A protein has these predicted regions:
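Alpha/beta enzyme core
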Residues: 1-95, 101, 105-150
Length: 150
């Protein structure tokens, strides 16, 4: 699978999320890259962070499926990273991200409550532990006293 436009390798070099293919020359370059990747045998192509008309033109001109991530509706399929869908990041999202839930706050609250319960001795409680038959427990304690167990 090929990947053009914004790629993980270019993020730091570009200084973060930057749209690719905004000029005619850059858009033509992306099309050339797409055709070259198809030619070398890519079975599909991710088009990331590019203007929708550029992604649509690429999709119309290559014979392999395109998956868009911030590339508009003209691709054959869409990608949205699950961390973004669920709102797990505490940061400003790229323009193409639509957050469907804010689980970050829920998750942080859950871990804080867990920590508080452990520190206060409320977890684990009896209902969270496995019991032992009284006779077996007494036999085990006797074995410990006799030095039979370790």
């Amino acid at each position: 699978m090929g990947h053009i436009g914004l790629t993980p390798q270019t993020l730091s070099r570009l200084g973060g999320y930057r749209v690719q293919g905004k000029t005619a020359a850059a858009a033509t370059g992306l099309l050339a890259d797409a055709l070259a990747l198809e030619e070398v045998g890519c079975y599909a192509l991710v088009l990331e962070a590019m203007p929708a008309p550029v992604a649509t033109a690429i999709t119309e001109r290559i014979g392999i499926p395109t998956l868009g991530i911030g590339a508009g509706p003209g691709c054959d399929g869409q990608v949205l990273v699950f961390h973004d869908v669920l709102g797990l990041y505490d940061r400003v999202n790229p323009r193409f991200v639509k957050e469907y839930a804010n689980l970050r706050a829920i998750i942080l609250n859950a871990f804080a409550a867990y920590r508080d319960d452990v520190v206060a001795g409320r977890f684990p409680a009896d209902e969270h532990t496995y019991p032992m038959d009284e006779a077996a427990a007494a036999e085990f304690q006797a074995a410990l006293r006799d030095g039979a167990a370790g």
